[in-house]
């Protein structure tokens, strides 16, 4: 009898019901979920909706997982997930009934950098809050939260027991660099230099400002800083203070390749045998360069997240890309993500293509001067623009788009152009569905476009949301769909990876690549995520010179030559991972690094022949 009871217990516990606060509106529907639920019909209170309740309440113990309520809900507010295994005993935190649930925690180690990798909405920021001591883990008992004695006995025998004991005795001070740096000007006022002086506890301010290239903006007000400058300022503010735990939530957004590596070196300069460093990062090549070991997070965004045990850097990132955790024998993604140099047009197709030429151009904006060398492009190819921030990549794209007139009389090829700007500000006052209907009416109902672009970008899930309420990543996906849905000869896409998580970046890269190739169009892409840039590029336009003063955009080069030239400017070398061919940065002055620099091969494509 007890065996049967145990089995029932396990069956009950491996189901999780989520009701979305934003979508569930019991006063605006006929409560179809409650009326159609077979358990409610049998007289048990599986779904409760009282006249005063704001959202429906589902009992996970009584739910049989039939999924009828999920289909019947007019607002698509209910999600019922059968958990992969009995994870109930590993619950670390749950916010409330029918809400997000986090299983297990990453285990930081003193003197090493822990990297966290996973999708958006899977619990990385929740894990950081708990490890920083800002959120008390309730072990899933949201109605009756446990006290610290119970929490410590729960983590007994693991490294986290000592960690939380130290936090409780108040021996550990935690500093967190926030994820959304664009919110900083709303909270902080003053000049950069003054704010840094106030917090300079380690007396390393000058050194850190030099590493992060902040010395020339010390007199500027916070409100006048660009996204990249705010990001570097936020990293500097954390690095100059004394603390035991340093946490960085997405330190590379808004930064160019060179600044990303400088930020990584600055963060690694904090290493000390007694200090903990935790980094959440979506740019996999930077995460690889920055971390000593990695924890992956998998699950269903917004529903539940599971933290894996720590792995070495290479193994951790490969597990994330494979979508399979060997230690738990758990597959969390149906297909693995690989970086084989992607499909390109055959010689026959190249002969039939249209070839376009753009002339040499010069553009002066205030004190900044951009010189563009003459170049050409053809259908079905993507040109990636590589250069630091402030070298005129967006200016070049806007000149091609006809939004900006070059100096003098210059004839640009007459082309229809679709442009996705770098900064996306939602002005539209209605739902996503209306926006798509207004802007790309023909494309968004076309079965081919739905299969190639809309489905992989998961637009269906956000169709009925207000455009004003979308998160950064959702806005980015909508902007990409709008850009690709507009009929044009040339697609100009400025930073498609901003706000997207690692998985969405790779999906977006595949979507852009496939669409441009099959629709026989041309794409110009500005991208700082190195993995995404290498995946997308057929040819490369390198922009050199002194940022914000005088720069030159060279004519397009092959991927290998262009990358070599660009990496030589940065002084970095790349190798490829033998398993999934992703580019990996060599550690500075390592054997491989010295060897490649000596031979002048900064970018390796040696296994391209066998792909």
UniProtKB/Swiss-Prot annotation:
Residues 15-45, 54-83 form the 4Fe-4S ferredoxin-type domain. Pfam families: ABC_tran, Fer4, Fer4_RLI. ATP binds at residues 118-125, 387-394. Expressed in early and late larval imaginal disks (at protein level). Keywords: 4Fe-4S, ATP-binding, Cytoplasm, Iron, Iron-sulfur, Metal-binding, Nucleotide-binding, Translation regulation, Ubl conjugation. Changing residue 38 to L: Larval lethal. Viable but with reduced body and bristle size. Residues 78-323, 350-570 form the ABC transporter domain. InterPro entries: 4Fe4S_Fe-S-bd (IPR017896), 4Fe4S_Fe_S_CS (IPR017900), AAA+_ATPase (IPR003593), ABC_transporter-like_ATP-bd (IPR003439), ABC_transporter-like_CS (IPR017871), P-loop_NTPase (IPR027417), RLI1 (IPR013283), RLI_dom_1 (IPR034348). Ubiquitinated by Cnot4. Ubiquitination mediates the recruitment of autophagy receptors to the mitochondrial outer membrane and initiates mitophagy. GO terms for biological process: negative regulation of neuron apoptotic process; nuclear-transcribed mRNA catabolic process, non-stop decay; regulation of cell growth; regulation of translation; ribosome disassembly; translation; translational initiation; translational termination. CDD domains: ABC_RNaseL_inhibitor_domain1 (cd03236). GO terms for molecular function: 4 iron, 4 sulfur cluster binding; ATP binding; ATP hydrolysis activity; iron ion binding; ribosomal small subunit binding; translation initiation factor binding. It comes from the Eukaryota. It is found in: Cytoplasm. GO terms for cellular component: cytoplasm; cytosol. The ABC transporter 2 domain is necessary and sufficient for association to the 40S ribosome subunit. Interacts with components of eIF3 complex, namely eIF3a, eIF3j, eIF3b, eIF3c and eIF3i. Associates with the 40S ribosome subunit in an ATP-dependent manner and independently from the presence of the eIF3 complex. Forms a complex with Git and Pak; the interaction with Pak may be mediated by pix/dPIX. Plays a role in translation initiation and quality control of translation. Together with pelo and HBS1, is required for 48S complex formation from 80S ribosomes and dissociation of vacant 80S ribosomes. Stabilizes core components of eIF3 complex promoting their assembly into translation initiation-competent complexes. Belongs to the ABC transporter superfamily. ABCE family. This is Protein Pixie. It comes from Drosophila melanogaster (Fruit fly). The gene is pix.
């Amino acid at each position: 009898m007890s065996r049967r009871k145990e089995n029932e217990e396990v069956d009950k516990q491996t189901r999780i019901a989520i009701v979305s606060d934003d979508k569930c509106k019991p006063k605006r529907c006929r409560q179809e979920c409650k009326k159609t639920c077979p358990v409610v019909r049998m007289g048990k209170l599986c779904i409760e909706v009282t006249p005063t309740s704001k959202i429906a309440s589902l009992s996970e113990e009584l739910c049989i997982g039939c999924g009828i309520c999920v289909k019947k809900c007019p607002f698509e507010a209910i999600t019922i997930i059968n958990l992969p295994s009995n994870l109930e005993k590993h619950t670390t935190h749950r916010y409330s009934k029918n809400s997000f649930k986090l299983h297990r925690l990453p285990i930081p180690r003193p003197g090493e950098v822990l990297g966290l990798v996973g999708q958006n909405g899977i619990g990385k920021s929740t894990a950081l809050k708990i490890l920083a001591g800002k959120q008390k883990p309730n072990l899933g008992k949201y109605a009756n939260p446990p006290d610290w004695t119970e929490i410590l006995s729960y983590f007994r025998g693991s490294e986290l027991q000592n960690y939380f004991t130290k936090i409780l005795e108040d021996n550990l001070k935690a500093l967190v660099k926030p994820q959304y740096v664009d919110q900083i000007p709303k909270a902080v006022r003053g000049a950069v230099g003054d704010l840094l002086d106030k917090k300079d506890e380690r007396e390393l301010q000058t050194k850190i400002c030099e590493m992060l290239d902040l010395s020339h903006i010390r007199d500027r007000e916070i409100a006048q800083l660009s996204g990249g400058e705010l990001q570097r300022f936020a990293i500097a503010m954390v690095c100059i203070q004394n603390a035991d735990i340093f946490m960085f939530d997405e330190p590379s957004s808004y930064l160019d390749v060179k600044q990303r590596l400088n930020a990584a070196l600055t963060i690694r300069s904090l290493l000390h045998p007694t200090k903990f460093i935790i980094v959440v990062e979506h740019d996999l090549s930077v995460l690889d360069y920055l971390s000593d070991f990695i924890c992956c997070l998998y699950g269903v965004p917004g529903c539940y997240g599971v933290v894996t045990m720590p792995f070495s850097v290479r193994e951790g990132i490969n597990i994330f890309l494979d979508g399979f955790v060997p230690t738990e024998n758990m597959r969390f993604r149906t297909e693995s993500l690989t970086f084989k140099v992607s499909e390109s047009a055959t010689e026959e197709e190249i002969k039939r293509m249209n070839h376009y030429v753009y002339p040499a151009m010069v553009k002066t904006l205030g004190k900044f001067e951009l010189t563009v060398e003459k170049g050409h492009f053809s259908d079905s190819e993507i040109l990636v623009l590589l250069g630091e921030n402030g070298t005129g990549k967006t200016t070049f794209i806007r000149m091609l788009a006809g939004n900006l007139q070059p100096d003098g009389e210059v004839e640009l090829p007459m082309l229809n152009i679709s442009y996705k700007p770098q900064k996306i500000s939602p002005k539209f006052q209605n739902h996503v569905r209306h926006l798509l209907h207004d802007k790309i009416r023909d494309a968004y109902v076309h079965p081919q476009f739905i299969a190639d672009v809309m489905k992989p970008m998961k637009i269906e899930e956000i169709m009925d949301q207000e455009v004003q309420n979308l998160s950064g990543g959702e806005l980015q996906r909508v902007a990409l769909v709008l850009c690709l849905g507009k009929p044009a000869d040339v697609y100009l896409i400025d930073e498609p990876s901003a706000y997207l998580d690692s998985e969405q970046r790779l999906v977006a890269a595949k979507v852009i690549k496939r669409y441009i190739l099959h629709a026989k169009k041309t794409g110009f892409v500005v991208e700082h995520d190195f993995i995404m840039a290498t995946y997308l590029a057929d040819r490369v336009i390198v922009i050199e010179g002194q940022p914000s003063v005088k720069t030159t955009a060279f004519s397009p080069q092959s991927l290998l030559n262009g990358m070599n030239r660009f990496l030589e400017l940065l002084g970095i070398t790349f190798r490829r991972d033998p398993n999934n061919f992703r580019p990996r940065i060599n550690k500075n002055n390592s054997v491989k690094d010295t060897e490649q620099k000596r031979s002048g091969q900064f970018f390796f494509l040696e296994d391209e022949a066998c792909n």
